[in-house]
Amino acid sequence: MKKRKALWVTMILLILVSLGIWLYQGDLPAEVVDAKYTSPSSQFLTLDDGARIHFRDEGNRTGLPVVLIHGSMASLHAWTPWVGRLGKTYRIVTLDLPAHGLTGAVPSGDYSGAAQLRVVQAVTSHLNLDAFVLGGNSMGGGVSWRYALEHPESVLALILVDASGPSAWYQARREAKPDKASPLAFKLLGQSWFRAIAARIDPYYLAVQGAKSAYNDSPVVTDALIMRYYELALRAGTRDAILGRFNSWQGPGRQSEDLSVLTQPTLILWGREDSVISVTTADQFQAAMPHSQVIIYDGVGHAPMEEVPERSAEDVRRFLKALKRGEV
């Protein structure tokens, strides 16, 4: 009996060790990832706390500045389709927030919302942008309207693309009807047991499932797009930084910001099939913000700027032209 028990214990240990080896994935050297995902437009700004922020300043340098902020787990590469379509007329500035893209981990370990706002301010100040249009997708949309609340004098207009809203909106929705369709990575990162191992396991499956879910199985989800998410996540230090960011957001409570004080003209763009942030949130934004307009894209998921770049860029162009004429 003892021999049989010892055999079973040994077999279980071997299975667990084999599973751990199979799931394990080490980091990729930062210099290797950087070499692949930088472009001739890439620049790096070192802040006082040692953080090295990756940003791009592209398009028409004499045009109206438009600053665009990516979403959670994404990078400034998400805005490439708009840069190509809007850059002839507008100056397009994109950046990688801490724990993302080629910015990655920062020495301070501060991945809070306040730190995100400081990065936006640092980059725009570095570029001497006193006033600009500010836009963002998902988490980046939340960064955008929060920045406008803190620096209303700097933000001429807002572009919110499937943007995150005040946390109280989502807390109430989760309690009423838990969302079962969103990318698996976001659900798992909400679990303490997964965060304990997430920095060492291979995130490839999560990258595939997350992209297909967020992009509503759009044909833009190519092998290259999946590898971009995957390799940027594996950049040395980034997975630990992602965990630091999610840990810093645990237990947000029911705080709510008064969006009605935002008087800037606001364009709200949303994919009707968004599995990350419900399309009903677009109506909440419009109800909360007095000078806003909404455009909904049928058959589109969480990233209209990538899924329907021509249509969404044209809607932005129309909005910015109306802004210049004082018609919004």
Please place each PLM-identified region on the residue numbering.
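Conserved alpha/beta-hydrolase catalytic His-Asp/Glu region
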Residues: 33, 170-173, 195-261
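Conserved HGGG/HGGXW glycine-rich cap/lid loop of the alpha/beta-hydrolase fold
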Residues: 58-102
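Catalytic active-site module of serine/aspartate enzymes centered on a nucleophile-bearing elbow/loop
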Residues: 291-328
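Short beta-strand/loop motif that positions the catalytic acidic residue
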Residues: 262, 268-270
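Acidic catalytic loop of the alpha/beta-hydrolase fold
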Residues: 273-277
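Alpha/beta-hydrolase fold catalytic core
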Residues: 1-64, 89-90, 129-130, 321-328
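Flexible "cap/lid" loop of the alpha/beta hydrolase fold
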Residues: 149, 159-195
